[in-house]
Amino acid sequence: MLSDRQLLILKIIVDDFIRSGQPVGSRTLSKKEQITFSSATIRNEMADLEELGFIEKTHISSGRVPSQKGYRYYVDHLLPPVRLTQKDVQTIQSIFHEQIYELEKLIQKSAQILSDLTNYTTVVLGPSVKEHKLKTIQIIPLNAETAVAIIVTDTGYVEKHVVTLPPSIPPSDVEKMVNILNERLTGVPLEDLTDKIQTEVAHVLREHIQSYDHMLRMISSSLDLNAPAQMFLSGKMNMLRQPEFSDIDKLRGLFNIIEQEKEFYRLLRKHNQQGIQVKIGTENDVEGMENCSLITATYSVGGEKLGTIAVLGPTRMEYSRVISLLNLVATDLSKALTMWYQKD
C-alpha cells in the first residue's frame, strides 16, 4: 500500500514524463506546488518507489522514469479525468454529420481522425464478414453460360462472384431463384446461411427451379464468404515522432508487428471486451511491443459488438486524453451505425 506522499510523487513523475519525455529528479519535484515536504523526504520516497518497482533509473540521467508497473498503477488508480475541448468534440462529430453510406469509409474516416487528434497510430477492426447479415443477392446473366452473383450485406460490404449457369436454364428460373433467396435469407447472418439453405430453401428451390442441384451448389459456393475482418490503419508514421523509437531496432520491431496483419489481427481480436481496455508493454504479449501501450474500445450496433478501435502509442502515452477521445469515437460510431441499421 503506497502512502499519500508516494502516490503524489508517483503521479507527478508519470505526468511530467508523459509531458516532457525527460526523467524526473528530486530537484524538479521540489519545485512543484503540491510538494510541501523536504528534498531529503522526496529522495527517500523516490528510493522507496524505486525499490517497490514503480519507477526506475535511466542510464543517462539521475532522474527517474515510470516503470511498466508504475504506468499500470497510474492508469488503474491515479488517472485524472480529461475534459475534451469543444474543438476535439466538433472534429469527431463532423465525421458522423457527413453523408457516408458505406461502413468501410466510415471506419476509415474514424481511424484517420483519431490518429490526427492523438498523434499516435490508430487501428480499427471491422466486423468479420461472417458476422454480417445478408441484405440482398442478385444474379445477373452475362451470357448463356455465365452470370455474376452479387452479395450485399447489411454493413454495405459487397462481394461478386462469376458463376456457371446450368445449360439451357430459362431466365425466368434465375429470377425465381433470386426472389426465393431474398425472401428467405434476407437478415440471416452469413455464417448461418448454409444451414438455412439446406433446411428452409432447398425444398422450395426443388419445387420451382429446373436444374435444382446445380443451382443450389452454385449459390452455396457464392455465399461461402471466408474473408477475415477488415483492418484499417492510420497514422503509422506518427510513431517516428516518438523519441522512444529513435532507436532503429525498436522501430523496426514495431513496424514488423504492424506489417504482419495476421499477428496484429490476432492481438486485436483478444481485446474484444466491452469498455476501454489498456494493455501496457509486455501485457500485450507480443515481442516488439515492450515499449508500447495499446488502448482499445469496442463499437456496437444496438448493444451487439461489431468491431474494435485501438490506439497504439508509446508507454509514455497521454492516457487520459486518448481514453477520452477513444471513448467518444466508439460511442458516436456506435450511435451512427445503430441509426443506420435501424433505417435499413
Swiss-Prot record:
NCBIfam families: hrcA. Belongs to the HrcA family. Coiled coil: none annotated. SUPFAM superfamilies: GAF domain-like, Winged helix' DNA-binding domain. Keywords: Repressor, Stress response, Transcription, Transcription regulation. It comes from the Bacteria. It holds the Pfam family HrcA. One of its GO terms (molecular function) is DNA binding. This is Heat-inducible transcription repressor HrcA. One of its GO terms (biological process) is negative regulation of DNA-templated transcription. Negative regulator of class I heat shock genes (grpE-dnaK-dnaJ and groELS operons). Prevents heat-shock induction of these operons.
